[in-house]
C-alpha cells in the first residue's frame, strides 16, 4: 500500500491497494541502435538489388546477339533503380527524418561535465562545513612527528 496515496489522481481500487502507472520509454541508445540496423539493412538490400540488376544487364548484353529483344527497357529500370538507391543512401546517411529526431536525441543526452562539476561543488561544500578529514599519517607528518 502506498503511503502517498493522496498524490494519485485516481482513487485506489477496492481493497485499498494503489497501482503505479509507469510510462514505458525506450532508451535513446536502443532507438539509435534499431535505426542504425534498419539503415544498414536498407543499404545492403539496395546494394544486393544493384548487383542483381547489373547481372541481368550483363546477361542480356551477352545474349543480345542470340535474341532479338529490346535491352533499353532493362536499362531504363536500371537507371531508375540506381537513382532510387542513391537517393535512399543520401537520405540514410543524412541521418534525419526532418531533423527533429536526431537533434532531440542529442539534446536528451546527459551532460557529464555538469554532473561532475556539481559533484565537485558538493564535495567542496562538505569540506567547508564539516572540515577536511585527513588520514592519521598525513596529520602526523604535518605536525612533524
UniProtKB/Swiss-Prot annotation:
Record's keyword terms, sorted: Host cytoplasm
Subcellular location, record wording: Host cytoplasm, Host perinuclear region
Main location as per UniProt: host cell
Note: Expressed from the major late promoter (MLP) and produced by alternative splicing. Only protein expressed from the MLP during the intermediate phase. In the late phase, this region is spliced to allow expression of all late proteins. Very stable protein with a low turnover rate.
GO CC term (a single one): host cell perinuclear region of cytoplasm
Keyword Transport among UniProt keywords: no
Organism: Human adenovirus C serotype 2 (HAdV-2)
A matching Pfam family: Adeno_52K
Induction: Expressed in the intermediate phase of the viral replicative cycle.
UniProt protein name: I-leader protein
Domain of life: Viruses
Amino acid at each position: 500500500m502506498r503511503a502517498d496515496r493522496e498524490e494519485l489522481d485516481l482513487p485506489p481500487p477496492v481493497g485499498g491497494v494503489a497501482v503505479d502507472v509507469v510510462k514505458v520509454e525506450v532508451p535513446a541508445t536502443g532507438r539509435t541502435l534499431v535505426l542504425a540496423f534498419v539503415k544498414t539493412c536498407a543499404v545492403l538490400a539496395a546494394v544486393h538489388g544493384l548487383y542483381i540488376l547489373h547481372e541481368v544487364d550483363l546477361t542480356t548484353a551477352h545474349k543480345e546477339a542470340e535474341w532479338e529483344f529490346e535491352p533499353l527497357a532493362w536499362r531504363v529500370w536500371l537507371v531508375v533503380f540506381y537513382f532510387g538507391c542513391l537517393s535512399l543512401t543520401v537520405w540514410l546517411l543524412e541521418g534525419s527524418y526532418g531533423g527533429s529526431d536526431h537533434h532531440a536525441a542529442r539534446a536528451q543526452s546527459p551532460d557529464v561535465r555538469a554532473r561532475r562539476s556539481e559533484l565537485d561543488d558538493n564535495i567542496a561544500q562538505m569540506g567547508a562545513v564539516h572540515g577536511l578529514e585527513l588520514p592519521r599519517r598525513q596529520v602526523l607528518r604535518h605536525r612533524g612527528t
